């Protein structure tokens, strides 16, 4: 056998659902890489003969390989911060009250409109580096802090550039319909409709013309866009060839998840107020449920997502950081594993699936990454742990040892 590298003295959490063992585990295992792909994996005792002198052999010292982690929902590119709003919330103000008073998303818009691409790139690269140090190898980055054509394009260009200058794969999402900008908000519902016209008729075509986005998203909520407005944006995005997803049922239940299911969305995100009808709908459409415990924690929410219903209807559950300056300024995927278990009562295996296999599905990357099996990309992490559950159990001491991305050893 001729391979580019071989890993031995390892255990593997393949996260392959076709395997009967928890985590799709293979103990006392080995793995071989060729041309950036996994060429072989299995029990070390079954490892085919290969040229030991010509092949780099890496010893895992009894650690565990997992798929590279995936953060499937972030707002990584922004300027400024909202520490003042943090203080207001601690004094009793709600997220909605702050937003209606001109804070929230809109307060970040000015900072992003004023910042140039170099400043935004430098800020975002630091955040991406922080995720990468925790084993993240794929990340989704949304726009949504421009709310005008030029700034939305600027944010997406920065996100695309990050992916070109970093080993982490970047999936970009256009979120022009994140909030109603101040210049339209004073006109009431007519202003919101006029802004949706701008998103549909000018922003989306420009984004697609520059190939700046892989998907489009909308914040469907009573403080943002109603169902009709949401459908206009998502339908237009679909027509232009973009994947679609939706912020839905975070603060109330408007039926956004059922709309997302009808339109074939990749995911619905937040979903604290999702009901059984919505769960049934996304189960039938194959739409993923993206859970965002960082926002739940930071906003001190009490309404839990319907985890038992999602399990009952076998909806793929994704865990993501929702890293953003207002509701989840928490740049840590490993912490999301712990929060997913402690706050949402996921099992450690469900949590790990939420940042590997299911996250890949939510981003349309499940034929490439998220599971370790022959033919998939060689995209994995080596951890100094005795069981995969440790990744969710303990936080603060990073157990990451190595990262392989596309067959290339990144971190030692």
Swiss-Prot record:
Pathway: Amino-acid degradation; L-histidine degradation into L-glutamate; N-formimidoyl-L-glutamate from L-histidine: step 3/3. One of its GO terms (molecular function) is iron ion binding. It comes from Shewanella amazonensis (strain ATCC BAA-1098 / SB2B). Its cofactor is Zn(2+); Fe(3+). Zn(2+) binds at residues 73, 75, 247, 322. 4-imidazolone-5-propanoate binds at residues 82, 145, 178, 250, 327. GO terms for biological process: L-histidine catabolic process to glutamate and formamide; L-histidine catabolic process to glutamate and formate. Fe(3+) binds at residues 73, 75, 247, 322. Keywords: Cytoplasm, Histidine metabolism, Hydrolase, Iron, Metal-binding, Zinc. N-formimidoyl-L-glutamate binds at residues 145, 324, 326. Catalyzes the hydrolytic cleavage of the carbon-nitrogen bond in imidazolone-5-propanoate to yield N-formimidoyl-L-glutamate. It is the third step in the universal histidine degradation pathway. InterPro entries: Amidohydro-rel (IPR006680), HutI (IPR005920), Metal-dep_hydrolase_composite (IPR011059), Metal_Hydrolase (IPR032466). It is found in: Cytoplasm. GO terms for cellular component: cytoplasm. The gene is hutI. Belongs to the metallo-dependent hydrolases superfamily. HutI family. The keyword Metal-binding applies. Binds 1 zinc or iron ion per subunit. SUPFAM superfamilies: Composite domain of metallo-dependent hydrolases (SSF51338), Metallo-dependent hydrolases (SSF51556). It catalyses: 4-imidazolone-5-propanoate + H2O = N-formimidoyl-L-glutamate. Its EC number is 3.5.2.7. Gene3D superfamilies: Metal-dependent hydrolases, Urease, subunit C, domain 1. This is Imidazolonepropionase.
